[in-house]
Design a protein with these regions (language model features):
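Helix-loop-strand module that forms the ligand-binding subsite of alpha/beta enzymes
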Residues: 1-14
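Non-transmembrane alpha-helical segments in soluble domains
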Residues: 7, 35, 118-122
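Extracellular ligand-binding/catalytic regions of CAZymes and related secreted enzymes
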Residues: 68-86, 90-147
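Catalytic beta-strand/loop cores that center a nucleophilic Ser/Cys/Thr
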Residues: 12-92
Length: 147
């Protein structure tokens, strides 16, 4: 938890979460594969996670609408009544995508949330060329794979 490299990779540190309840997510960046198909205001029934120690290099994709949230201890952020909930960034030679949503089985059963997750995975993988596994063989057990 106190490993600075890991905090920069993840993009923030967990602070706390509100009780499970309905709230809205605001799509900030609709050009990302994990958000491009979502409505501008995305109604959720989930736990609203709060974070601290944000990496300034993250690209915020979605924020929580904190205004109507039922939570007497909700912190006040520089963004006012919003708080980042989904973000991504390029980091240390790779890519990272994070969603703070998805705390029950019903959420993962929806096609919309599955597409959200798949869009994040697609972005992380990027435009890598597929490997030709026909070339992945060794003549002896100690030979390196030729790809």
């Amino acid at each position: 938890r106190n490993w600075p490299w890991f905090k920069r990779l993840i993009g923030a540190s967990f602070l706390r979460h509100a009780k499970h309840q309905p709230f809205k997510e605001i799509i900030i960046d609709a050009d990302h594969p994990s958000t491009s198909f979502l409505p501008k205001l995305w109604q959720r029934d989930d736990e609203c996670y709060f974070f601290k120690e944000y990496n300034p290099d993250i690209r915020v994709l979605i924020v929580h609408d904190l205004g109507p949230l039922d939570d007497k201890d909700k912190p006040t952020y520089y963004g006012g009544n919003s708080s980042p909930s989904v973000w991504c960034h390029e980091f240390d030679g790779g890519r990272q995508w994070y969603t703070s949503l998805g705390h029950d089985i019903a959420t993962y059963a929806t096609a919309e949330f599955q597409q959200h997750i798949m869009g994040g995975i697609i972005w992380v993988v990027g435009n890598n060329k597929p490997l030709d596994y026909r070339k992945a063989h060794a003549k002896t057990p100690n030979d390196p794979l030729p790809y």
